[in-house]
From Swiss-Prot:
It comes from Shigella dysenteriae serotype 1 (strain Sd197). The gene is aroD. One of its GO terms (molecular function) is 3-dehydroquinate dehydratase activity. Its EC number is 4.2.1.10. InterPro entries: 3-dehydroquinate_DH_AS, Aldolase_TIM, DHquinase_I, Type-I_3-dehydroquinase. Pfam families: DHquinase_I. Keywords: Amino-acid biosynthesis, Aromatic amino acid biosynthesis, Lyase, Schiff base. This is 3-dehydroquinate dehydratase. It comes from the Bacteria. CDD domains: DHQase_I. Involved in the third step of the chorismate pathway, which leads to the biosynthesis of aromatic amino acids. Catalyzes the cis-dehydration of 3-dehydroquinate (DHQ) and introduces the first double bond of the aromatic ring to yield 3-dehydroshikimate. The active site is at 143 (proton donor/acceptor), 170 (schiff-base intermediate with substrate). 3-dehydroquinate binds at residues 21, 46-48, 82, 213, 232, 236. The keyword Cell membrane does not apply.
Amino acid sequence: MKTVTVKDLVIGAGAPKIIVSLMAKDIARVKSEALAYRETDFDILEWRVDHFADLSNVESVMAAAKILRETMPEKPLLFTFRSAKEGGEQAISTEAYIALNRAAIDSGLVDMIDLELFTGDDQVKETVAYAHAHDVKVVMSNHDFHKTPEAEEIIARLRKMQSFDADIPKIALMPQSTSDVLTLLAATLEMQEQYADRPIITMSMAKTGVISRLAGEVFGSAATFGAVKKASAPGQISVNDLRTVLTILHQA
């Protein structure tokens, strides 16, 4: 399986990488939170742009991105607008969503974008090609905050992302039972062993799914999300605790 290198970070080798999400509503808070995050032990900074209030002003969005880049120049920056239908803060048209991601790519300020699988096949393929032409990596994602589908469906979605040339396929699912967590882990392992030719990220959410956020190195998930202050999804644990557990499992 090939790895993905962003800046000096090799994703898909060694312990799972820690991603933290910054969810500030305005430029002032972007700046203050970035300064606080800078003191934290993590690997990738995800900017959750759907929390940013002045979204219609592309210049304002990119000014905030510039602050993040300048505050943490060594950290890979993942630009994510999470749509309302997949658990995000704001609804957005497909056209505006694609335009926003293209603006981020054009800015030269971001290393990676998050692109939702179910945006529309043609739009997804075109945006992946556009990102790659500008040396920006793509995390292709799918989130279900209500249920966990069968393992076959989980694998099918991850394989579809791979077929669309995502650099890193990602899926996050809500368990209704502990067996749903096992379904996610089994699907992750099967994908990683039989189909994946690149790193994947998977997680089962809420308290029930916490084990999936810790056991990525065992089952085949290359990264996990930790909380600096407020969790961006149910079940996230603090980055310090997360690093401790990932290190223990890596060194065992």
